């Protein structure tokens, strides 16, 4: 039996350039991705380069709090 909290947790990644600009006028919103991470292997915040459909380019997506 597993003890303690689950090792894999669900995290939300948000586009940092959209969030920084506050969803500027030409942007329709803020891009978000849902993924999982292993808490033991990556205890720090996760940052990945993903495609943002609102910026029309690959940008850094950072982990946000729920």
Curated annotation (Swiss-Prot):
Signal peptide: none
The species this protein was found in: Ceratophyllum demersum
Any one of the GO BP annotations: translation
Any one GO molecular function term: structural constituent of ribosome
One annotated Gene Ontology cellular component of this protein: chloroplast
Taxon lineage: Eukaryota, Viridiplantae, Streptophyta, Embryophyta, Tracheophyta
Principal subcellular localisation of the protein: plastid
Pfam families in the cross-refs: Ribosomal_L33
Assigned keywords, A-Z: Chloroplast, Plastid, Ribonucleoprotein, Ribosomal protein
NCBIfam families associated with the record: PRK00504.1 (NF001764), PRK00595.1 (NF001860), rpmG_bact (TIGR01023)
Family: Belongs to the bacterial ribosomal protein bL33 family.
Entries under PANTHER family matching the protein: 50S RIBOSOMAL PROTEIN L33, CHLOROPLASTIC, LARGE RIBOSOMAL SUBUNIT PROTEIN BL33C
Protein name listed in UniProt: Large ribosomal subunit protein bL33c
């Amino acid at each position: 039996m597993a003890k303690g909290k689950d090792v894999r947790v669900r995290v939300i990644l948000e586009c940092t350039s959209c969030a920084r600009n506050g969803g500027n006028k030409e942007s329709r919103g803020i891009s978000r991705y849902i993924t999982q991470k292993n808490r033991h292997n990556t205890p720090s915040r996760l940052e990945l380069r993903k495609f943002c459909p609102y910026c029309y380019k690959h940008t850094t997506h950072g982990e946000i709090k729920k």
